[in-house]
């Protein structure tokens, strides 16, 4: 049975996120000035999506309106002030002389007016574990309970190149690590780590916007590359050191750059795009980085605010087949413009879902569950053009190519692959249902297919029975399957060009809306929860048998069809129908 999907319970507004908003000042926040900052800034035009894959949407004037404010101050919450004060007390109590710096994403997010609970402290003269031990000594000296210290060892597969110590301070997890510099061997992505200066540490970061420090000792933001704040102003994704050298040192940084550009709707710098498109860099990304790390980055993109922008950037930089590697032999083989079709489908699904809006994707479910379903919907849309491609695995079993990419290329959960395959299969069944509901086709053939010698379905109930059986199989995620179906069918050779047309998307939106309304009018939404009017035990009583078996299973299916054809029918009426059907059949058999 396929996993339950509830994409129709996404937050109001559909799949697309709302515009970024500046957070209102709070009386609990204390303003910390930047070391050098001329005021609030607005970002230059950035890429958005509503038309062609990989093309900027809207006029320059429209793009100018989509700007993100960068704060001129860092605002500390009351809890953050308490945490930082406690850390400074430790330094002063033991005379450590340590400069405490909050590193990376926390500083970036604060300047962008976003809350962040990800506090990483960089230490300039000691290891993280040693500092945590000093914290515990201090806690003991003031009569407080010591805290446990977790040490995260180096683990390159999880991008952990240096030992990190973690402990709970005022109910908040804090990571501690020493400042570092690093160099890479020619044949390895694992760096040689050395204790470094703050400036060396800043330059070894992946991006300038992630290289900023907040110095707790003197309450200031440090921009030691000289570019971090300026690049935030411009909305630019830039590497502190030359991009090609940075990517060859750690090719995963290509995907990190794309992910952060998508998250903040920033622009990739031209030299960065050129380096990311370099054949050697692409080769290193495919051969030097584990598939698990690649899959983790892609999954973060798909779960973030602007997944379509990320996928489009991957395609535009020539990285699609590096990231989404295909099996060696598939049937049919990879077709022309396969990558473009995949990108077109995820963008069309995103735009279609947003245009349909809250009547389809309404609130009422656990937000984490909603996010998970949105993620699976996007994977399904991305791989829709591959739904009829298969390969033979080691056991000569026929496996969908989309399943291979999810499980082998991205190393995601097997259940993710199963869900995507199930959505594609459901979409195909929905195509048949759409044809039935949308046209005046003769239902005679379908009527005969649903009936047998014991069951006769009224002509005006055929559509309801057929649709009900499909929905009972698809269950909660029928709207997802319908969304994928109206994008995938009818098939078009030039899908890349077709799906970018607003009038075409409008037609498919109208089709979705009509079918969704028809299913609702037939009172089938939730039909999979319908309790059978007759259970197996009741059927056995009518049949006058003492044990179940295939015969009872067949009658359960007939009773379900009868129930769908007679939504107001009672148990007694269903039993009477069964008795009459058996009696009629017995008379026919006797006469013959």
Feature map (PLM): residue ranges:
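Catalytic cores of the polymerase beta-like nucleotidyltransferase superfamily
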Residues: 1-592
């Amino acid at each position: 049975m396929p996993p339950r999907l509830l994409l129709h319970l996404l937050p109001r507004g559909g799949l697309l996120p709302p515009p970024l908003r500046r957070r209102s000042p709070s009386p609990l926040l204390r303003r910390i000035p930047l070391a050098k900052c001329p005021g609030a800034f607005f970002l230059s035009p950035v890429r958005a999506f509503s038309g062609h894959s990989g093309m900027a949407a809207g006029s320059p004037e429209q793009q100018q309106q989509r700007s993100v404010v960068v704060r001129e101050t860092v605002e500390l919450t009351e809890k953050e002030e308490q945490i930082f004060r406690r850390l400074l007390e430790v330094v002063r109590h033991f005379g450590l002389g340590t400069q405490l710096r909050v590193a990376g994403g926390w500083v970036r997010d604060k300047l962008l007016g976003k809350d962040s609970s990800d506090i990483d402290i960089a230490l300039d003269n000691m290891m993280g574990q040693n500092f945590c031990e000093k914290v515990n000594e201090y806690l003991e000296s003031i009569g407080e309970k010591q805290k446990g210290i977790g040490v995260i060892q180096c683990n390159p597969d999880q991008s952990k190149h240096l030992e990190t110590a973690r402990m709970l301070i005022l109910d908040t997890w804090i990571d501690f690590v020493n400042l570092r510099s690093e160099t890479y061997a020619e044949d390895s992505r694992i760096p040689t780590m050395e204790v470094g200066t703050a400036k060396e540490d800043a330059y070894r970061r992946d991006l300038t916007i992630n290289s900023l420090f907040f110095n707790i000792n003197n309450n200031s933001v440090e921009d030691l590359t000289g570019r971090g704040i300026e690049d935030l102003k411009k909305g630019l994704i830039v590497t502190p050191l030359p991009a090609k050298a940075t990517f060859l040192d750690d090719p995963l940084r290509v995907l990190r750059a794309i992910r952060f550009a998508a998250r903040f709707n920033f622009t990739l710098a031209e030299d960065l795009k050129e380096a990311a498109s370099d054949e050697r860099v692409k080769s290193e990304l495919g051969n030097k980085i584990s598939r698990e790390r690649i899959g983790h980055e892609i999954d973060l993109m798909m779960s973030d605010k602007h997944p379509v922008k990320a996928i489009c950037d991957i395609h535009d930089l020539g990285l699609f087949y590096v990231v989404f590697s295909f099996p060696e032999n598939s049937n049919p083989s990879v077709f022309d413009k396969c990558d473009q079709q995949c990108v077109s489908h995820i963008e069309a699904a995103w735009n279609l879902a947003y245009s349909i809006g809250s009547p389809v994707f309404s609130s009422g479910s656990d937000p984490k569950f909603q996010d998970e379903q949105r993620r699976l919907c996007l994977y399904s849309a991305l791989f829709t053009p591959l739904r009829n491609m298969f390969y033979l695995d080691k056991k000569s079993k026929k496996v969908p190519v989309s399943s291979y990419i999810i499980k082998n290329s991205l190393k995601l959960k097997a259940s993710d692959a199963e869900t995507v395959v199930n959505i594609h299969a459901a979409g195909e069944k929905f195509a048949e249902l759409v044809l039935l509901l949308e046209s005046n086709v003769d239902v005679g053939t379908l009527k005969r297919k649903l009936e047998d010698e014991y069951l006769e379905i009224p002509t005006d109930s055929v559509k309801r029975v057929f649709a009900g059986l499909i929905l009972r199989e698809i269950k909660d995620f029928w709207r997802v399957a319908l969304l994928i179906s109206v994008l995938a069918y009818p098939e078009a050779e030039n899908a890349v060009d077709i799906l970018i047309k607003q009038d075409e998307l409008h037609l498919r939106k109208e089709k979705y809306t009509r079918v969704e309304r028809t299913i609702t009018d037939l009172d089938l939404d939730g039909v999979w929860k319908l309790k059978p009017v007759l259970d197996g035990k009741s059927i056995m009583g009518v049949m006058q048998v003492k044990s179940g078996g295939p015969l009872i299973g067949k009658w359960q299916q007939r009773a379900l069809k009868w129930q769908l054809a007679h939504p107001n029918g009672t148990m007694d009426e269903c039993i009477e129908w069964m008795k009459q059907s058996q009696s009629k059949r017995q008379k026919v058999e006797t006469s013959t």
